[in-house]
Regions:
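The alpha-helix within a helix-turn-helix
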Residues: 9, 20, 50
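Key DNA-contact positions within bacterial/archaeal DNA-binding proteins
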Residues: 17, 28, 58
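Short C-terminal boundary/hinge segments that cap the last helix of small helical domains
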Residues: 54-65
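A short, Lys/Arg-rich alpha-helix, primarily the initiator
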Residues: 1-15
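Recognition helix of helix-turn-helix/homeodomain-like DNA-binding domains
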Residues: 25-39
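Residue-level detection of the helix-turn-helix DNA-binding "recognition helix"
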Residues: 10, 24, 35, 65
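Short, basic-rich loop-to-helix N-cap that marks the start of a DNA-contacting helix
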Residues: 38-48
Length: 65
């Protein structure tokens, strides 16, 4: 699974801390996913991030198996 988190955050002018807080995950965890977009994460965390970004799973994460 790959992700577009960084691109979406930048295009919306958001802060990593804001998204992490709204997703209910640590800033460090979100930063890890941004810096290593091929890193996998749980479906639960992926959904939390998508909800915080107000974007569908298919737009934020690619190659979802």
């Amino acid at each position: 699974m790959s992700n577009n988190i960084k691109r979406i955050i930048e295009s919306k002018g958001l802060k990593i801390r804001f998204i992490a807080e709204n997703a209910g995950i640590s800033r460090q965890n979100l930063s890890r996913l941004i810096n290593y977009p091929e890193q996998s994460t749980s479906l639960e965390t992926a959904i939390k991030i998508c909800n915080a970004l107000n974007e569908p799973l298919e737009k934020v994460f690619t190659n979802v198996n």
